[in-house]
Amino acid sequence: MTAQDPTKPAGDKPSVRMITVPDDRAGQRLDNFLLGQLKGAPRSLVYKLVRSGQVRVNGGRAKAERKLEAGDEVRVPPVRLNEEGDKAGPPEAFMRRLEQAIVFEDARLLALNKPSGVASHGGSGISFGAIETLRALRPGQTLELVHRLDRDTSGLLIVAKKRSALSELQALLREDHGAGIRKRYLTLLAGRMPDGVMTVDAPLHVGLRQGGERHVQVNAIGKESISHFRVLERRGGHSYCEVRIETGRTHQIRVHAQHLGHPVAGDDKYGDPAVNKRLREQIGLKRLFLHAASLEFALDAGKTPYVLNAPLADELVEALDRLR
């Protein structure tokens, strides 16, 4: 028996739907809007539907990242998912792990202390990321990622529970130079950094290597990127630092640390292989030592302040303790 392509007509498929975007979905990306309409559909299927032109906005083709406006007409094609109620959900143990990682929640948002190795969202061979798992935990709620963290970075990941909170938080994220959301990271850098604050103001450009892998480098044609590094403690010839960033570019801290000549410990992409090997053998560091430790912002036009913190992951605390 051959597998059914869910984008092809078959059996008792639902018909084409024309959906008018409501006011509370204005500003939402097309792919996220479709994920809400096609419950249980994997993100890869949504992208396939968009790329193939089966999804239309106001009668025309659109890109997955298009921001919708209130009143837009979205054509949602008939989709046949697996007979067993779409697809299997996230494993129970993984769901419990993420539920225990929630460090803050109110009526508008929740904050997750995302473990290293967990993607912010699924796709590209990843069945379940943090957002898919949280949606499985809270099937009656509308949850949307406010931002993303690299898969190997641990720490604060913010999820909006209301459309109004998502819009306000994303507007704050667009305000560079710390005007919107103040972000603080903890990291271990290779080598001995000098005292004081070291500011890296170096534009970053995202390129693609063979095979489609993203690679970021300092380049004059890139986007403005500013990071401030400060040594908290020196251990074993290396520097435990806090980093405050004014911009939120892809791999920003990792590439700026490399640019300083003090790459992030455990960084397989931008780091020093010899240092990584030595730290793996000496202190058992098997992951990227980069942690999103705190976020500060205010909602309601500055009237409701939030100060969110995520404790350093146990494996990083233990690695630091072994580093003498």
Enumerate the predicted regions with their spans.
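Short coil-to-beta-strand transition motifs
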Residues: 93-97, 218-227, 289-290
